[in-house]
Amino acid sequence: MSAEGMKKGTRTPGVTIWLTGLPSAGKSTIAVRLAEVLTAWNMPVELLDGDEIRERLSKGLGFSRQDRDENIRRISYVSRLLTKHGVISIVAAISPYRATRDEARAEIGRFIEVHVNCDLSECVRRDVKGLYKKALAGQITQFTGISDPYEEPLKPEMVLNTHAERLDESVGKVLETLSLMGYVPAHYLNAATTPRPAMSEEMAASTGSGGGTAGAGVSGLVASE
């Protein structure tokens, strides 16, 4: 959609922002903050968090390749419907397999893949639940990044290096991309005066919380990755 169209009040089209990365890379933290900002701008937004969707929409699915793929397909279906109806759908899910993410892209259409990249050592440090420690000790099987593969995106629209960036930097990059692609009016970005919290400590705490909703005005579907 053109900038001229947005100035005339034409509703912006929906889009899916798909945040993928290792456990504790910062996907949920970025998704929550992004949803907060977009909600403050009165943009239609929904947050689909992988951990929460596991509890609601995919409750009964395990962590085999087949079950993981089915879980992502369910998230993709919901996100496609939201996108179709003009909503900015933010997905925060490990979604470890490249082929399944490519399926989601093909199904949804308006799709921005964001690789939330983080050094494995930093992910382990942030993991307040101790899941990495258990996986490294062999107490958890099929754990992404340790005993199960994570296939990095080959050509994502964006890469966020969360071990080196502050939270506001990562979120700002996504907002700028949304503006350049016509999904957010540019004047919103230019006039933004949002708080700028440091990433490292906040990211560590939020990432270990298992996800969550993005605050008032943002509803979170609860699911699993």
Question: What are the functions of these language-model segments?
Answer:
Residues 23:
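The conserved Walker
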Residues 56-63, 67, 79-135, 142:
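ATP-dependent NMP and nucleoside kinases share a basic, alpha-helical "lid"
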Residues 1-16:
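Extreme N-terminal, non-catalytic leader segments
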Residues 117, 125-173, 180-201:
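Small-molecule kinase domains that catalyze NTP-dependent phosphoryl transfer to phosphate-bearing small molecules
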Residues 27:
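Conserved lysine of the Walker
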Residues 32-77:
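Conserved substrate/cofactor phosphate-moiety recognition/catalytic segment
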Residues 47, 111-115, 157-159:
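Conserved beta-strand scaffold positions in the cores of enzyme catalytic domains, especially
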Residues 19:
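Hydrophobic anchor at the beta1->P-loop junction of P-loop NTPases
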